[in-house]
Amino acid sequence: MDQRRVEDIAQIGAYSLPYDIVNIVYGAIVIYRASQEGKDPLAYASNKQGFKEAVKKLIKLGVIEKTTPYSLKKEYEEQVEKFDEIINYEDYERARYELYKLSEKADNLFTSSLVLYASVFLSLSELKPEILKIINEYIDQQTKVDYGKWIVIGIATASVLFAIASVLIHILAHVSIW
């Protein structure tokens, strides 16, 4: 799954995860990817819903440097890079092992958010790949934010998320034990 799809799934996640967590993950990914491509994140994500809120949250947490363009502090950039790798693994067992290792650093809201989001993302990917494929193909056709369509997507995914709630609760409880 390519990075743009991951960012779009992060927006869909706003319907199922605490808003702060979605902001943290989404903002960090956008800033990281923009810096890798030598672009200003604000311009890179100008048409992305919620990016300004994500930047504000990351500044408040002390995760990013207030430079132009914004950039993640080195220690956080390394975590996002690892997160980037983990959510793209096709081997779920390896992904969970790497997630476990990342969770050992989860002593702050930023890292905890990455771990939590990755857990949910991996669970959705493993249990409902056909649903994600349909959602991703639909999103790929979008060229701008359409609130009506996002609401429809949110409602459509709600039943899937509800159906696997027990699995997610088990995984998230396991993450908290780590």
UniProtKB/Swiss-Prot annotation:
Domain of life: Viruses
Function: This protein is non-essential for virus function.
Name assigned to this protein: Uncharacterized protein E-178
Taxonomic lineage: Viruses, Viruses incertae sedis, Fuselloviridae, Alphafusellovirus
